[in-house]
Amino acid sequence: MLTVLGEPPVPPLCKYRAGGCVSCRDMSGPSTTLRNGLALAGFIVATFLAPLAGIFSMPGAWYAALVKPAWNPPSWIFGPAWTLLYTLMAVAAWLVWKRDGWRRPLMLYGVQLAFNAAWTPIFFGAHELGWALVEIAALWTAILLTLLSFWRVSRPAGWLFVPYLAWVTFATALNFALWRLNPV
């Protein structure tokens, strides 16, 4: 069996099947390493697909013209921050998958990814600061539920979601400030 970041050994995935299966009893072979590597790559790709929803809704002259709070971060920080956060999210989802398979925590992960993907077109595409605020509040809630669900399966996975929740908390405050400073 494999251990992850000092956690107890990962149980064989076939434990949920009656009697198990011969091919799944030993989870330490080369095929498991390949399977885990491909799964991690899949989680990274799937997670990085979320921001592609906003590729046609990038900040432009409209965003530059908005009145911003003094604590608005410089534009260059968003790319590196989101790259790090998406990587942490993917690794967290992979850790949960390794321990629990495709269950409720990963369904919540998919829901929060959908909310994540929806914010950019609403904010930057439709220029709807109020609706973007409603949407990001739903995203924040979905992230919290995902974090708690991940925590129950894998504490390291839960911890990996904390920076994401913190960043979206900040983004929610920023969205609120922009909405208040720029009435329609």
Please provide the spans of the model-predicted regions.
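Membrane-interface helix termini and inter-helical loops of multi-pass transporters
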Residues: 59-71, 181-184
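Membrane-interface helix caps and helix-loop-helix hairpins in membrane proteins
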Residues: 121-131, 179-182
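Membrane-helix boundary connector in multi-pass membrane proteins
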Residues: 123-129, 145-158
